[in-house]
Amino acid sequence: MSTTKPICLVPLHVVIVGAGIGGLSAAVALANRGHSVLILESTSELSHVGAGVALPPTTRKWYESEGVLQVDDTACVPLEGIEITKWDTGELVTRTAANPAGKQTAIHHGDMQLALLARARELTNVEIRLGARVVDVDLEATVALLADGQRVAGDLIIAADGVKSTLKAKVCPPEAVVPLPTGEAAYRFTLPRELLESDAELRELVQRPWGVRWDGPSCHVVAYPLRNHRLLNVVLIHPDNGDAKESWTSVTDKQNVLADYQGWNPTLLKLIALAPPEVPNFRMFLYSPAPVWVKGSTILLGDSCHAMLPYLGQGVAQAVEDATAIATVLSLIETRKQLPLALRAYESSRKERVDQIQAATYRAREQLHLRDGDAQAARDSQRKATSGTGQNSDVVKMQQSYWTWDAAGVAEKTLAALIIA
C-alpha cells in the first residue's frame, strides 16, 4: 500500500458509527489527511474482547505509516510462517514460510483496538463519543439519529457498526441483511506463557515465531503466540452444537470442548485442558455480499458490508483496505460537488475484490475440514510435496493474491477514471 498521505483539498466533517477496528482505522486515516472526524460508539466503555488476529504485511506497514503501531511494537509477534499438521498424530504435513511480501503479524484484537484508540485520541481533529447509540440515519440530510433523540449531521456518514449493523438496512435491500447460519462455531481462548513453561511441547508453541494448524474432519485448530510471546492464542473451529451465540460473551463448559476434540493430537488436548473452565464459543454466520455500499452520503465499511468468516484471516485486512480507499478518494477531490464521484470510486474500487475474497473464504473451509479418506489424503500429499518449496497452493497463492494489493492506488485510479468520464 502507498504510505503517502495527501492532505485533503476539501476538508470534510465525517461521522463514523462504530469504534471497532474498521471505524477507528478509517478515523485515523481521514484525520491524518486533514478531515475532521466524529466517532459515535454505542458502548460506554471499549472492552478488551476477542482473541488474536494475524495482520498481513501490507496491513502492518499501513498501521506503522499511520502512527498506530511501532516497528518494534511489543504487542506484536512477527510470524515466520505456519506449520500444518495431522489432526490426530500431529505429524508435520507442510511448513510454509513467509513469502516475499513479508511476514504476518500476530496481535490481540483488543490490543489492536486500543492502539487505534490511542492514536485517534492523539489527533486533535478526532472526537470520540462513547455511549452514543445510533438507531437510524436520515439519508437525505446526512444526519445520524441517536437513541436519546440527538441528531448529528456530517458531510459523510460511515457505517462501521459491525456484523450486526443497524445502518446496513438503510443502505441495502432487506434480503441483503439476513445472515445464514454456517453450521459452525469457534471456541477461542488465550493461555499465559506461565501455564505452558513446564511442558516442553507447549512451551515451544508460545516461544517459537510460528503458527500451528491442525486440520481435521469438520474441524480445524489454529494456535500462535501473542504479546511478545507472553500469550498463546488458540482458535478451534467446530460444528455448531446449538450451544453458541453470535456474541463475544457466549461461553461453554471446557468439558464440551474436550469432548468435541476427543481423539485429536495429544498436544492439542493438553492445551484445551489448560483453558479456563468456561470457554468463549462464537456462532459463525454467512453474510451475503452487500449489493450496495453507498446511498446518498452514507457508506458501509468493514464488517457492516463484508463480514468475513475466519478461514483466510482477512477480516481486519479488508476493513483496513476500505479505510485506505475512502481516505484516499476523499483526499483527492477538488470540490464538494465531487463527493458523489468519490463515494462511487470507493465502492467500485473495493466491492469486486471483497466479493471474491468472501467467496474464497467460504470455499476454503471445505479444504480445511475434509473427512478422513481419499480426498484428505490427496490434499495432504500435495501439501507434503510442496512443503518448503514456496509453491504450497493453499497458502502461498493466497498470500500472493491478498497480501500485495494497493488499495490506495486502485482507489486513486478509479476516481481519476470517473472524473475524466
From Swiss-Prot:
GO terms for molecular function: FAD binding; monooxygenase activity. Its main location: membrane. GO terms for cellular component: membrane. Residues 371-392 are annotated as: Disordered. The chain crosses the membrane at residues 9-29. FAD binds at E41, A54, D303, V316. The active site is at R188. Keywords: FAD, Flavoprotein, Membrane, Monooxygenase, Oxidoreductase, Transmembrane, Transmembrane helix. The keyword Protein transport does not apply. Belongs to the paxM FAD-dependent monooxygenase family. This is FAD-dependent monooxygenase atnJ. It comes from Arthrinium sp.
